[in-house]
A protein has these predicted regions:
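Amphipathic alpha-helical assembly/interaction segments
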Residues: 1-138
């Protein structure tokens, strides 16, 4: 029996899937002349792409690390924090690009919603790891 979409719980690794989607969306937008003109691409476009790729690769890296080793758990937490930090940098870059290039509001809204959703998923994953670590320690 299948579960209705509205009743589904988020998958454990929606964070990874959404990060890849956000990275793709960011790369596509950063290369569009109407969003980041060539004159601004070296300053804004490249940084947007680099930040999106950093976020996605750090999430992938964190996912390969296990919680049953103290060293790996610590490294995983660091990768998660760095990925979360990248989402905040990405949000700043998106707002800056909008202020400079005045691309469409609907694109800005959708893009920032994707980033906010990724931040929520990342925080949820980090909280889940924290709860699992505490449960294993008890």
């Amino acid at each position: 029996m299948s579960v209705r979409r509205s009743e589904r719980k988020p998958s454990k690794m929606d964070v990874q899937t959404k990060a890849a989607e956000l990275a793709k969306y960011t790369i596509d937008n950063a290369l569009k002349e109407s969003i980041v003109p060539k004159r601004d691409r070296w300053a804004l476009g490249n940084r947007l792409v680099d930040t999106a790729l950093e976020m996605a690769t750090r999430i992938d890296s964190a996912n390969t690390l296990r919680l049953d080793s103290i060293e790996e758990a610590s490294q995983r937490r660091l990768e998660q924090r760095m990925a979360l930090s990248a989402t905040f940098r990405m949000m700043t870059l998106i707002h800056t690009a909008r202020a400079i290039t005045h691309f469409e509001e609907r694109i800005h809204k959708h893009w920032t919603e994707l980033v906010s959703e990724e931040q929520e998923l990342l925080r949820g994953w980090m909280d889940s790891d924290r709860r699992r670590s505490k449960a294993n320690a008890d």
